[in-house]
Amino acid sequence: MSTAGVAAQDIRVPLKTGFLHNGQALGNMKTCWGSRNEFEKNFLNIDPITMAYNLNSPAPEHLTTLGCASPSAPGSGHFFAERGPSPKSSLPPLVIPPSESSGQREEDQVLCGFKKLSVNGVCASTPPLTPIQSCSSPFPCAAPCDRSSRPLPPLPISEDPSLDEADCEVEFLTSADTDFLLEDCVPSDFKYDVPGRRSFRGCGQINYAYFDSPTVSVADLSCASDQNRVVPDPNPPPPQSHRRLRRSHSGPAGSFNKPAIRISSCTHRASPSSDEDKPEIPPRVPIPPRPAKPDYRRWSAEVTSNTYSDEDRPPKVPPREPLSRSNSRTPSPKSLPSYLNGVMPPTQSFAPDPKYVSSKALQRQSSEGSAKAPCILPIIENGKKVSSTHYYLLPERPPYLDKYEKYFREAEEANPSTQIQPLPAACGMVSATDKLASRMKMDVGGHGKRKHLSYVVSP
C-alpha cells in the first residue's frame, strides 16, 4: 500500500453515499463520512514517515481538490487521481465556498479529527476527501503539501533482509574502486549498525588463503595505496577490469578470488626494479649428469678404444672348477680313457679268466668271503676256449663241494697210482654235467686234462 493516498479499503468504516457510480465526489461531508464521533473511532493506516515529512515542511500548505476516483482500481494503492478530474467524468468536482457557515463548521470538525490523530502520532496527514481551498488552523500538519510541487515521500525501509544482503554482495563484487575494499565504506542510505540486521558488510576480513600469490596484509596494501595517492605516476597503468570473477578450485565451493589481490601488482608497477611483488622461487637443484650408456659391444672386436673404464664392465667370471668324477654305474663318456686312433678295443669279460688268474688268487678270494660269487664256466670245445665273452653262468657253488675237493686231494697225494677224478661242481645244469662226464670218459689217463678240468670247474 503506497502512501500517496488513502484507499477506501484502508478506511474501516463503510461509505454511505460518498461515491456515485460515475466516479464524482460530493461536497456534503455529512452524507459521506457521517458524524464526527463516528469518524474519530475509525483507524487510518497511514505510514509515520509521511507524518514526519509533513511536520518538517516549512512551506505553506493548502488542500488540493479531490479528483475522480476510479472504481476499477481500488487495491492498487493510488486510489485518488493527482491531476484533477478524470477525462471520463463530465462534471467538475464540487467546491464549497468558505463563506458558507454550514460548510465551514463541518470542515472544522474534520480538521479537528485530523489534529487529534496527528498529535497522538498514530498517523500523518493525508489529502482528505473534502475539497478545501485553505486552512485556517495554525497547526501545520493538518494540511498536506501540494502534489504537483512536492515529490513523493521516500520509500519505507524494507524489512526483508535478503534483498539488503543481495544488494550489498552485488555492490561489493562489482565495485570498480579498489580503495573501496581497503578504506571505510561510505555510509549509504542503508543502516548497517542497526541491531537485528543480517548484513555483515562492514565487519568482514579478506581471507588470503585462497590466493595464488604470497600473502599481503591489509596494512601493507593501505600504505601502498596512500603512497600512490601522494606521488602520482606520470605514466598511469591502464585500468584493469575488476569485475571478472575467478573461480578458486582449491577453496570451498562457491568461493571467488576478490580483486583486492591485484592492488599489489598495480602499486609496484611504478618501480619495475623492486622484487617485492615477485614470488620467491627456491634455487634449482642441479640435475646430475646422465650416466654413461653401457657398451653392449664390449665382448666383440668392435671395441677398440679405452673410453669405457673398468667400472662400467661387469665383473669377470672365474673359471669353472672341474667336476669331480662321480662313482655312478654309468659314467659319462668324457671320463672314459681315450684310445689310440679313436678305436675302442673289443669288450672284455669282467669274469676272472683262468689263463691269467692263479690258484692262490682264487683261494684268497674264497677265503675272503667270495664264495657267494656266481660260478662262471667258460665254453671250451676241443680243448680250446671258444669265446672270451660268452660263458656259462652257474648257480653259486655249495659249501660242501670244498669238503669233497679236499678229500680227493688227500686221496690223490696218498695213493698217486689210483687216479681219482675229482667231482665237478654240483651245478644245476644237466647239459654241463653230461659234457663233463663224457669228457672224463674220453680222457681218463690224461693228467693234464684232469688238472685243466679241475681248474675250470673250481676256479
UniProtKB/Swiss-Prot annotation:
Q: Which gene encodes it?
A: Errfi1
- PANTHER family, sorted: ERBB RECEPTOR FEEDBACK INHIBITOR 1, GENE 33 POLYPEPTIDE
Q: Which organism is it from?
A: Rattus norvegicus (Rat)
Q: Provide ranges: composition bias, Polar residues.
A: 264-273, 324-335
Q: Name one GO molecular function term.
A: small GTPase binding
Q: Sites of the modification N-acetylserine? A: 2
- Region feature (Disordered): 227-352
Which InterPro entries does the record match to this protein? Answer: Cdc42-bd-like, EGFR_SigReg_Kinase, Mig-6
The protein in question is named ERBB receptor feedback inhibitor 1
Kindly state the subunit structure of this protein. Answer: Interacts with EGFR and ERBB2.
Q: What induces it?
A: By cAMP, glucocorticoids, phorbol esters and insulin.
Q: Where in the cell is it found?
A: Cytoplasm; Cell membrane; Nucleus
Mention any one GO cellular component term assigned to this protein in its UniProt record.
Answer: cytosol
One Pfam family it belongs to? GTPase_binding
**Purpose of the protein:** Negative regulator of EGFR signaling in skin morphogenesis. Acts as a negative regulator for several EGFR family members, including ERBB2, ERBB3 and ERBB4. Inhibits EGFR catalytic activity by interfering with its dimerization. Inhibits autophosphorylation of EGFR, ERBB2 and ERBB4. Important for normal keratinocyte proliferation and differentiation. Plays a role in modulating the response to steroid hormones in the uterus. Required for normal response to progesterone in the uterus and for fertility. Mediates epithelial estrogen responses in the uterus by regulating ESR1 levels and activation.
Record-listed Phosphothreonine modification sites = 126, 130
Question: What keywords does the record list, in alphabetical order?
Answer: Acetylation, Cell membrane, Cytoplasm, Membrane, Nucleus, Phosphoprotein, Tumor suppressor
Q: Where is the composition biased (Basic and acidic residues)?
A: 310-323
Asked if the Swiss-Prot or TrEMBL record annotates the protein with the keyword tRNA processing, the reply is no
**Composition bias, Pro residues:** 282-291
